[in-house]
């Protein structure tokens, strides 16, 4: 068989991988494109139409009679519907017939008033007599606007009050919440992998069982425990130490399980040779196990950092929603408003929040696969 010829199974695998890559990449690309689009266009068309003109229906109220001017014996109110962007394709003065007239045509209004709208959005309301009334005429129109990309969405998010403080709060939460469970889990994993003691198998089974416990079930009991301990010592329960301990508790089962599997797959001969040379368990752990286990440590660090950085629920419960301790995800939720309809803010915020996780991922990603797969077959 010619080795240069690939089997149908190989082609099927490659196509499947390509399909998975596209399924993961396309939503991210759509998010990026949406974050750079004008908010009016984003509200009426999808990101896949970003390079084509978009059509939207809108209504604008003309200036009131106080702004009318006299010109050649006529009274005129003028303005522009589009603010210099796009082209009007139809207009009207009633919600029942919003596209009754074409640009350049004249619509007869009440009391002898006449409305004319041009394709560039400029309009005039002309009357032979002085116009009365405190409210301006409503003008319905359909406009076609060319594609427009802008950084205004990012500027609005970055200029919001408290963003810088919330960014530092998220770092203050995420970094210790990643380092602390790694340190604790590394010692526990070494003991479960290489230090025989009674009940080791039962303890490992308990750790595996904790992996399936829903986080939400333990939030309220833990908060009550923290409040009780805080009241006993006379300190507030909603502190950084509290959320560090919470994230440590939630992350330890996965960390211990992942690191134990990796350490159990390391060559036994290395540890035995070190013991023959008089090395203690602590020396073996620090000088041999930890350096060899760096891929597994980096793999868990990626998962833990991503979780704690993007977390909102645990941060609100254990840290609170005060301005001085609000994390970045909480600040961005406040920017979206109660209805969450500001898509331009949502898309720009999403890309701002993933900058730091992307840096962490690309810095450690070469260890990710090695850390997840090594030790998955061979056990200690």
Curated annotation (Swiss-Prot):
Domain ABC transmembrane type-1 per the UniProt entry, residue ranges: 167-364
Organism for this UniProt entry: Rhizobium meliloti (strain 1021)
Alphabetically ordered keywords of this record: Cell inner membrane, Cell membrane, Membrane, Sugar transport, Transmembrane, Transmembrane helix, Transport
Protein name: Alpha-glucoside transport system permease protein AglG
Regions that span the bilayer: 13-33, 179-199, 202-222, 239-259, 288-308, 344-364
Subcellular location: Cell inner membrane
Gene Ontology CC annotation, any one: plasma membrane
Top-level taxon of the source organism: Bacteria
Membrane topology per record: Multi-pass membrane protein
Free-text function comment from the UniProt entry: Part of the binding-protein-dependent transport system for alpha-glucosides such as sucrose, maltose and trehalose. Probably responsible for the translocation of the substrate across the membrane.
GO process annotations (BP): transmembrane transport
InterPro entries assigned to the protein according to its UniProt record, in alphabetical order: MetI-like, MetI-like_sf
The gene coding this protein: aglG
């Amino acid at each position: 068989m010619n080795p240069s010829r690939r089997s149908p199974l190989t082609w099927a695998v490659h196509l499947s991988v390509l399909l998975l890559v596209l399924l993961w990449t396309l939503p991210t690309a759509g998010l990026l494109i949406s974050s750079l689009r004008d908010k009016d266009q984003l509200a009426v068309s999808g990101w896949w139409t970003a390079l084509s003109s978009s059509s939207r229906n809108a209504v604008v109220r003309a200036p009131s009679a106080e702004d009318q001017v006299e010109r050649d014996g006529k009274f005129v109110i003028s303005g522009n519907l589009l603010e210099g962007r796009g082209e009007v394709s139809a207009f009207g003065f009633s919600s029942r017939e919003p596209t009754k007239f074409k640009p350049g045509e004249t619509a007869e209004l009440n009391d002898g008033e006449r409305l004319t709208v041009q394709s560039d959005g400029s309009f005039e309301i002309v009357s032979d007599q002085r116009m009365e009334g405190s409210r301006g005429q409503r003008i319905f129109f359909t406009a076609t606007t060319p594609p427009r990309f802008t950084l205004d969405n990012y500027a609005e998010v970055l200029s919001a009050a408290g963003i810088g403080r919330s960014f530092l709060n998220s770092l203050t939460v995420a970094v210790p919440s990643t380092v602390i469970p790694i340190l604790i889990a590394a010692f526990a994993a070494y003991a479960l992998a290489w230090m025989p003691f009674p009940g080791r198998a039962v303890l490992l089974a308990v750790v595996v069982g904790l992996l399936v416990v829903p986080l939400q079930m333990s939030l309220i009991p833990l908060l009550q425990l923290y409040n009780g301990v805080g009241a006993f010592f006379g300190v507030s329960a909603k502190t950084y130490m509290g959320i560090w301990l919470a994230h440590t508790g939630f992350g330890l089962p996965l960390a211990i399980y992942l690191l134990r599997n990796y350490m159990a797959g390391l060559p036994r001969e290395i540890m035995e040779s070190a013991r023959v040379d008089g090395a203690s368990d602590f020396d073996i752990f620090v000088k041999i196990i930890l350096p060899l286990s760096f891929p597994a440590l980096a793999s868990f660090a990626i998962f833990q950092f991503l979780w704690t950085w993007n977390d909102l629920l645990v941060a609100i419960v254990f840290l609170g929603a005060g301005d001085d301790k609000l994390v970045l995800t909480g600040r961005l939720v406040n920017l979206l408003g109660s209805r969450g309809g500001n898509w331009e803010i949502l898309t720009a915020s999403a890309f701002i929040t993933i900058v730091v996780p992307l840096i962490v991922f690309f810095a450690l990603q070469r260890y990710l696969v090695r850390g997840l797969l090594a030790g998955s077959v061979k056990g200690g």
